[in-house]
Amino acid sequence: MKILGINALNHDAAVAMIQDGEVLFAGHSERYSGVKNDSDLNAALLADSFRHGGKPDKVVYFERPYLKKLRQLRAGQYGEVLSRENLPSYYLRDYVGNSEIEYVQHHQSHAAAGYYTSPYEESAIVVIDAIGEFETCTIWYAWGSHFEKRYSLKYPKSL
């Protein structure tokens, strides 16, 4: 299965095309736009990923947008909550068409990136981040293609 992983609408937009565990393409938007920490995807980046990997079978986005909007609502960030431009399904339609988008937890995205690029068959993983959807710190146990969350610290608590 060919998977296109996307991080956008935050800082450091990036994509990775993976097939059966092999990275076919990976790139950051700032390399294409020249804008440091660019949050927007651009057409050339996506075109390169499709040129190297073809059309993906699945598109995976790095966070769950409705949980993030709920956190923004609770934090009083009403402009962000009401904006549809920062919804991945709206933002990505020009890039991935009607492809179904699977949303995974922000901290699980970090955990997977660390685990799948490590040489270990099983691992404990600690993710400490300013904030994901609600989580600020998580501890995972991973083996094979399984991830089990063992601990979670939630917003507004953070290290």
Question: Predicted regions: what is each one?
Answer:
Residues 1-159:
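Short acidic/glycine-rich loops and adjacent helix/strand connectors
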